[in-house]
């Protein structure tokens, strides 16, 4: 099974080029939109000026200091997240660990997250097989592309795990103050929902281009898992979320994308 899926992934997604620095996907010189860019179109804009002003009034800290702290926290989070992704990619691919260019408190936090991943691996990956890591996929009809952090096969249940690694301070599971934009207005504007939509698009593309080319694939088409694994800053262990396959909702988004292309 693993070899068949790996061969199909290579065959069906072989024509893509990815510029990591600019985060641009191209297929046969056509630029494809990323899954994250599509989803951002349905997320209310974060008004840093207005929100930092409110926080400043509430806390007594100057607005400029608050904004600067947010910028620094974002930069540090990206540095740690990039290094963690690289460690996990090498680990699950049985490649040697490359010492990251991370120093000081960020290195301390990175090592903590590495320990969290090692614990996750021990508790959840035993007996499972890694199909691939950092798998770039795309769909020619919608001209959309993205990268699956990790695809895992469970031979006992005959299902796949579509995994997204996160290193957030915390994943918001609800947001009673804000919803996504139409046609997704029934969903709260939370990390959980946005990551679930992202994984659902990845799964839909793989289902369409890979799984449907495999005989007797009904079980893993219907029963595979979409999984968010977060390695939070302020906790000692990982947190795992098995999310819904939001197939109908992402079909709505992709159909809107198709109309724009016509």
Please identify what each model-predicted range represents.
Residues 1-141, 145:
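Nuclease catalytic cores
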Residues 73, 102-106, 181-193:
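Short histidine-centered catalytic/ligand-binding loop motif
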Residues 85, 148-154, 159-175, 179-180, ...:
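Conserved catalytic cores of phosphodiester-cleaving nucleases, focusing on short active-site segments
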Residues 138, 167-170, 231-233:
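Short, solvent-exposed loop/turn segments at secondary-structure junctions
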Residues 138, 153, 227-229:
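A generic structural motif
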Residues 140-141, 175, 182-185:
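Gram-negative outer-membrane beta-barrel domains
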Residues 143-145, 158-160, 237-240:
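Short, mixed charged/polar active-site loops
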Residues 189-196, 200-262:
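Metal-dependent nuclease catalytic regions and adjoining charged, substrate-binding loops involved
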């Amino acid at each position: 099974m693993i070899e068949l899926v790996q061969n199909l992934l290579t065959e069906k997604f072989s024509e893509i080029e990815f510029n990591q620095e600019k985060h641009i996907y191209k297929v046969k010189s056509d630029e494809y939109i990323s899954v994250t860019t599509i989803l951002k179109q349905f997320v209310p804009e974060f008004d840093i000026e207005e929100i930092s002003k409110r926080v400043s009034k509430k806390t007594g800290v100057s607005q400029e200091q608050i904004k600067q702290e947010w910028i620094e926290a974002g930069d540090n989070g990206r540095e740690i997240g990039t290094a963690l992704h690289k460690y996990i990619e090498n680990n699950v691919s049985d490649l040697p660990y490359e010492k990251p260019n991370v120093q000081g408190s960020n290195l301390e936090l990175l090592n903590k997250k590495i320990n969290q991943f090692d614990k996750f691996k021990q508790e959840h990956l035993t007996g499972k097989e890694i199909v691939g890591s950092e798998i770039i996929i795309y769909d020619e009809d919608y001209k959309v592309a993205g990268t699956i952090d990790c695809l895992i096969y469970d031979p006992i249940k005959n299902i796949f795990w579509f995994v997204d690694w996160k290193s957030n301070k915390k994943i918001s599971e609800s947001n009673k103050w804000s919803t996504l934009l139409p046609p997704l207005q029934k969903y709260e504007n939370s990390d959980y929902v946005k990551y679930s939509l992202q994984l659902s698009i990845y799964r839909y593309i793989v289902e369409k281009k890979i799984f449907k080319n495999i005989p007797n694939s009904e079980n893993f088409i219907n029963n595979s898992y979409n999984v968010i694994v977060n390695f939070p800053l302020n906790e000692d262990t990982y947190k795992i979320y098995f999310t819904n396959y939001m197939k109908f909702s992402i079909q709505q988004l992709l159909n809107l994308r198709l109309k724009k292309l016509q």
